[in-house]
Amino acid sequence: MKIIKFLLIISFVLIINIQNLLADEAKMLKGLEIFNETAGCAGCHIMKAAGAEGNVGPNLDTVDLTEELVKDMVTYGLGVMPAYGEEGILTKEEIDIVSFYVANSSGK
């Protein structure tokens, strides 16, 4: 009986982890779409993970960014980068998703 309970617990934990991995993968794919198409980040930035070869903004392959830092930069802009949040270019949800994507793809 203890083995059955143990196996059920392990199965439950594995299912939860698989669901989280699938959710993260979906978020990464949506983030890539926002980066390349919706926001057009690829036009200015270099980032191998996105196939981006821009030449205006910083090379995102050479920096290790946190999700919060990316959110702030995308929302409020920095230098010549527009304020995608304040100017209504991206929704808060889109900013959250693209920030997750960049933070998990930059510096790699």
What residues fall within each predicted segment?
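Sequence/structural segment immediately N-terminal to covalent heme-attachment motifs in c-type
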Residues: 25-47
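C-terminal capping alpha-helices of c-type cytochrome domains
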Residues: 87-108
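N-terminal export/targeting leaders of redox proteins
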Residues: 1-25, 107-108
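Sec-exported extracytoplasmic/periplasmic mature domains
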Residues: 36, 65, 75, 79, ...
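Gly/Gly-Pro-rich "capping" loops immediately C-terminal to redox-active cysteine motifs
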Residues: 42-78
